[in-house]
Amino acid sequence: MKRLVVCWLVAAACRSPAIPEANRFPAGTGFTARHVTVDGTTLRYIDSGRGTPVVFLHGLGASMYAWRKNLEPIARAGYRVIAFDNRGFGFSDKPATGYDNASYARLTVALLDSLHLPDAVLVGHSMGGAVAAEVAIAHPERVRGLVLIGSAGLGAREPRLFRVGRWPLLGPLLFAFRGRGLTERLLQATYADPRKVSDADVDQYYAPVAEPAYGRALRAVLREFRFDALAGRLDHIRAPTLVLWGEADRLVPITLGRTLAAGIPRAAFLSVPGAGHSVQEEAPDEVNRLLIRFLKDGLARVPGDLAFGHWADIFPQPSG
């Protein structure tokens, strides 16, 4: 164990300069980054398109860059897409506290209020899925539909790095040395095929990590956020729900995805072959196809008593 920690510290100490602000996502796209202050936190966000609003919530250690391959196709299909760097991540504020599940849910609702949205479809990945589900439980009237992608909420085996990060002495030291190489390895672990992670991807993920407040915020998340908070509460989710999983997810096992879907009254479970935890990044075409199908057909056609596994007419499997 000590040897592993030392290796992490040595790797993390290899710091690299972050990309310039002018090159940060969404630079080079048709989107524009905006800022809004809600619930005492200034959030960096994207808001584009018309139609039913779809709000994207990223996972632990990520930012709205995690949705770079999904936003434009969903907007082009006729939807209003909203993505944001959540509190403590990306280039949004990183206060000392406010990282528990209820606080993140309240922040999400405050963002909807600031955008004058009575409700929206929430799409959450990993930790963002747990936040989206928390909103659906605590504020059901604000959630028109729910998409949970490789979602946290039922507990999963944490990377050892995160467990060490909670240690009183080693935690601050570990997160003080956040190198680009460490970011690259963590990102590759979320893919079934690590070769699909590009240098540009690593640059974008590393840019906020290099900020001084990032380590403190990440430690606060690991202290305050419960990654098993949905256990025993899934039947409180009333929104029509699509649960998506990469079949090669090594961080949150696919068995948890099936359990998640089975516990939600109006849910369907679908898996994507050959994709890991970051399935929306690794297999974007398939994820976008399923998302659009859910938005076009699933929201309107799902009856309140629909049982798990009966969505074959909405989501036919591709032939061949």
What are these regions (language model features)?
Residues 29, 38-39, 46-48, 76, ...:
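Active-site loop/oxyanion-hole signature of alpha/beta-hydrolase fold enzymes
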Residues 46-91:
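Conserved HGGG/HGGXW glycine-rich cap/lid loop of the alpha/beta-hydrolase fold
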Residues 137, 146-175:
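Flexible "cap/lid" loop of the alpha/beta hydrolase fold
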Residues 162-163, 176-236:
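Conserved alpha/beta-hydrolase catalytic His-Asp/Glu region
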Residues 267-268, 272-318:
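Catalytic active-site module of serine/aspartate enzymes centered on a nucleophile-bearing elbow/loop
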Residues 237, 243-245:
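Short beta-strand/loop motif that positions the catalytic acidic residue
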Residues 248-252:
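Acidic catalytic loop of the alpha/beta-hydrolase fold
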Residues 129-140, 146:
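Short glycine-enriched nucleophile-adjacent loop
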